[in-house]
Structures are given as structure tokens and as C-alpha cells.
């Protein structure tokens, strides 16, 4: 193990991930496609009555580890941000009817990740957002990094 010289190390970058679960329903349906095309593209997820998910979202921030606090950011602040950006607008909601963003955007998990990213980016210092990872099911996971 390397010995410490007592000098602070060069800037270190850390990653913090907070996990949050929420439930919501939606229907995969594009206004740019005919009813027949929607059924073909989205299958059972185009059911007119919609369907629901218990989403698990991982929000990861990246930044310099503050030499004084030892933190990239205060987890309490990240928790509040997630509450405002994810839980209040999305939990137990119909994404297509209750979230204005999805009025003309198909509520795929990819677009949900973009929505969460864009709103987290507005709520956090610019350098911090790193990744949004959404587990739609145990087998289906979407990752978005603002690219």
C-alpha cells in the first residue's frame, strides 16, 4: 500500500448513484404512425388501455471529490432533486396523459430517460449529470448519458 505524504492527492473524480423506484402506466403509440403501423411496431404495448411498469431508475452524477467535504455532492441534495424530477411528476401517473412532455413524444423508456436527464440537468450543476439508467423490467434496461 502506498504511503501518504500528507499532501492532498491530485483532483479525484467520483461517481455517486442513487436508486429510486416508481410506478407509472403508459401506451406506446406514435401520432406519426397509423393505427395498423402502431400495432405492428409496438405490439401488445400499443393496447388502447395502456399497461404499467414498476420502474427502477439509477441516477449517477460525476464530479470532483471535494477535498474538504469528501463528497462529489451531498446525497441529501441528490435525493431532493430526484424527488422533484422523478417522483412528483412521474410516480403513479399515466405518462401520456399526466406528463405534458409526452403529449407528442412516444413514452418509450428511451424517451423517459431523455426526459429525466433533461430535467435532472436543469436541477443540478452543469458538470454533475453522468448517467440515467432505467430498469423497465428485470431484462430491459435503458441507459442515457445526454449524448
Swiss-Prot record:
Q: Name one Pfam family in it.
A: PTPS
Q: What is its EC number?
A: 4.2.3.12
Q: Name one GO biological process term.
A: tetrahydrobiopterin biosynthetic process
Q: Return the Gene3D superfamilies for the record.
A: 6-pyruvoyl tetrahydropterin synthase/QueD (3.30.479.10)
Which catalytic reaction applies to this protein? 7,8-dihydroneopterin 3'-triphosphate = 6-pyruvoyl-5,6,7,8-tetrahydropterin + triphosphate + H(+)
Q: Tell me the enzyme class.
A: lyase
Q: Which GO terms describe its cellular component?
A: mitochondrion
One GO molecular function term of this record is: metal ion binding
As cofactor, the record names: Zn(2+)
Q: What else is known?
A: The active site is at the interface between 2 subunits. The proton acceptor Cys is on one subunit, and the charge relay system is on the other subunit.
Write out the similarity annotation.
Answer: Belongs to the PTPS family.
Q: Which PANTHER family match?
A: 6-PYRUVOYL TETRAHYDROBIOPTERIN SYNTHASE, PYRUVOYL TETRAHYDROBIOPTERIN SYNTHASE
Q: Output the NCBIfam families linked to this UniProt entry.
A: 6PTHBS (TIGR00039)
Summary of subunit composition and partner proteins: Homohexamer formed of two homotrimers in a head to head fashion.
**Protein's name in the database:** 6-pyruvoyl tetrahydrobiopterin synthase
- Organism (species): Poecilia reticulata (Guppy)
What gene is behind this protein?
pts
Amino acid at each position: 500500500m502506498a504511503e501518504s505524504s500528507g499532501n492532498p492527492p491530485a483532483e479525484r473524480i467520483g461517481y455517486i448513484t442513487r436508486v429510486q423506484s416508481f410506478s407509472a402506466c403508459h401506451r406506446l403509440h406514435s401520432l406519426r404512425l397509423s393505427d395498423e403501423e402502431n400495432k405492428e411496431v409496438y405490439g401488445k404495448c400499443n393496447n388502447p388501455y395502456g399497461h404499467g411498469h414498476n420502474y427502477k431508475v439509477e441516477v449517477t452524477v460525476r464530479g470532483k471529490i471535494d477535498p474538504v467535504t469528501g463528497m462529489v455532492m451531498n446525497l441529501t441534495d441528490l435525493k431532493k432533486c430526484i424527488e422533484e424530477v422523478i417522483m412528483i411528476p412521474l410516480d403513479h401517473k399515466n405518462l401520456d396523459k399526466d406528463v405534458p412532455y409526452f403529449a407528442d413524444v412516444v413514452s418509450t423508456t428511451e424517451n423517459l430517460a431523455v426526459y429525466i436527464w433533461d430535467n435532472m440537468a436543469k436541477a443540478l450543476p452543469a458538470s454533475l449529470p453522468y448517467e440515467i439508467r432505467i430498469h423497465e423490467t428485470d431484462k430491459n434496461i435503458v441507459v442515457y448519458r445526454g449524448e
